């Protein structure tokens, strides 16, 4: 079986009830969220306590001093999370059916991403033009 989701992808769109689950979760901005997430990973034992948070990419704007339209950015993060949430639900339904049919234990599940980072996020950076790479 092959399942291909178009989410998460621009344009960002999700069900209102899914977006509502994430209302307020991103209000503090990405810099604080990064710090909280690494601390939570330490507490859970997922990473070593001595591992440090990498510096924010120098091309990514500082949330506190450089983001002009925070409400827009917050909404983008809420909708993006809602898209992932709906995808997760769908994958869960597939897993449930595999278990019901008794074939889960004989199934390999691969999660693949074809796009890498979102190219539309250039507005979140100091970059104004696409960067062209050559080998």
Enumerate the predicted regions with their spans.
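Conserved small/polar residues in nucleotide/adenosyl-binding loops
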Residues: 125-131
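Catalytic-adjacent loop/helix segments of enzymes that bind and process anionic phosphate/sulfate esters
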Residues: 78-82, 86
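Metal-dependent active-site segment of extracytoplasmic phospho-/sulfohydrolases and closely related
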Residues: 47, 51-57, 86-123
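Conserved acidic, metal-coordinating active-site core of Asp-based
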Residues: 41
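Active-site His/acidic residue clusters
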Residues: 1-36, 46, 54-79, 115-124
């Amino acid at each position: 079986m092959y399942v291909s989701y178009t989410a998460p992808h621009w344009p960002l769109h999700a069900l209102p009830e899914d977006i509502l689950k994430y209302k307020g979760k991103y209000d503090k901005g990405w810099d604080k969220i990064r710090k909280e997430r690494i601390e939570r990973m330490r507490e859970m034992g997922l990473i070593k306590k001595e591992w440090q948070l990498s510096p924010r990419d120098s091309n990514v704007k500082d949330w506190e001093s450089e983001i002009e339209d925070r409400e827009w950015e917050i909404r983008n993060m809420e909708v993006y999370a809602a898209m992932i949430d709906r995808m997760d639900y769908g994958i869960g339904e597939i897993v449930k059916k595999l278990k019901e049919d008794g074939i889960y234990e004989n199934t390999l599940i691969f999660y693949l991403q074809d796009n890498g980072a979102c190219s539309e996020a250039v507005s979140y950076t100091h970059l104004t033009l696409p960067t062209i790479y050559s080998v």
